[in-house]
Amino acid sequence: MKHVIKRDGSSAAFDAGKIRVAIENAMLETTKGTDGKLSAEIASAIETQVGMSEREVNVEDLQDLVEDYLMSSERKDAAKKYIIYRYERDKTRDARKRRDGNLLADAFVAGFKHKPSPMNQLGSFVYYRTYSRWVPEEARREYWWETARRAVEYNCSIVPTSKEEAEQLYRNVFDLKQFLSGRTFWIGGTEVSRHYPMANYNCSFQVVDNFSAFRDVFYLLMVGSGVGVRVLKSDVAKMPKVRTDAEVIHEAYTPMLRSLRQDSSALEFSRGDTARIVIGDSKEGWVQAMEYFLKLHYSTEYRKINTIILNYDQVRSKGERLQTFGGTASGHQSMKNMFAKISNVLRKAARRSAADHVRLAPIDCLDIANIIGENVVVGGVRRTAEIVLVDQDDRDSILAKSELYKKSEDEKWVVDPEIAHRQMSNNSIYYRKKPTREDLHWHFTQMRYSGEPGWVNEEAGAKRRPNFNGVNPCAEILLDSKGLCNLTTVNVMGFARGGDGRLDRKGLLEAQRLSARAGLRMTCPELEIPEWNAVQQRDRLLGCSLTGWQDMVNAVGLSRDEQIELLKELRAAATEAAREYARELGLTEPLLVTT
């Protein structure tokens, strides 16, 4: 068999499959897509030519042949992409070698680099849309093997991890047998993950019993976490009253030069009764500006302020690229809309109470949380995921979406722009005691029309967690206020051996243990908001979850009793691994381990 000389001087057996994969990767970057027949023909032709050669063949020779064959075919578009990819990789090779001191060495990852993608077309679409980061030095997006490497290396670098564990985790992730959180696949190993650790977390929850809760909700949504919000009457009653008689003025937008922009927001005062908020050009600046805005309305320190001016000049223009998080800027208009809508909520509360100094109702807090989410979802690649938990007897909040649509002049149903922000959350009743049969009958009748409201049972949640106070937007994690959780997932169908109807039980249980260990590592970074970090260090919640269960059951034919037994084994494997690892690292044991 012919051998190929690699760049480090070692040799490896010629593999036509690697040639085919390289060609198809180039084709994937074109509008015409892949041509499996052509890639196989070229790979076969190169194999024949290499076999006839009397001299040694190196990697550069093979790449030259791929270029020649593609250029002589009808797929010159793929040839161009291949040439560009090769050129950009050559330019960055030395830099990549210098940083190859990681757990996953190039020699190990090379075995996956030329494997066909394990994803189908839909999976590939979701991956490139959601998780593949732009590689500026090579003018392309990441491939799956690179994303998996970046995320796994980040996770395993948080605390000392063995090379063997990192490699096994990588194998499973690459083969779609298990996953780290989607957030970590997007930001793991980037500057974002180091400066904004909370951006790794899928799940968070906040009780709205003070105005700083809105600051935290805004920040978490900005860094990509889904947020659960609770606005019970007893929660909102703890908040101070707000003044609603201040005039809010939005200055005309004149964008500042990039070199002159300030990241932080500023609060300026004049004439003793006027405050001006200059909104900074950063996540922190936006959050700070909203905190100033709310404080000017509720703090007695600012009771003499009757005019609030908002200046947006520092905010970058719409469409500018966001270098750190990725995507493009939403511009100043979304911020302006947010402040205008919050002002409307305060004025509505004043009209409802016939007073200028009022206490907000739960529906007002629901609106503010949704308005914040609406602002966040406008920009870049960010999305907003919210759930709002409301009282059983709070009909205003329960029916918040009942008039979301109205008829236009041409008799079409359209979203009412004044309350369009209410689309941002799923809303659920927070039952503090078991509902009656009549309650449930009414509840199901409501759900028949729109699927809402859902419900959360505090009694049931408290049995698993005494300090249970709410949930994340997907409602699979039991959380205390200011609590976070980072999901890790095992795809059980990935362990159903193809064709023979058997389950790789040993591999599945080992993956579950790896899942728990990966989750515990994610509780170790110090979070950027101290109150949230304190809860995190106290609870260290893990979110070991399973997917593909029914597919696996159908594939291997498990009975109900066998399913119950396997689920017990998986729960025990995760719990034991988490406790053992916590002791090994000298950490408190996780309060909860599985979803």
Predicted features and spans:
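Extended catalytic cores of very large enzyme megasubunits
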Residues: 1-595
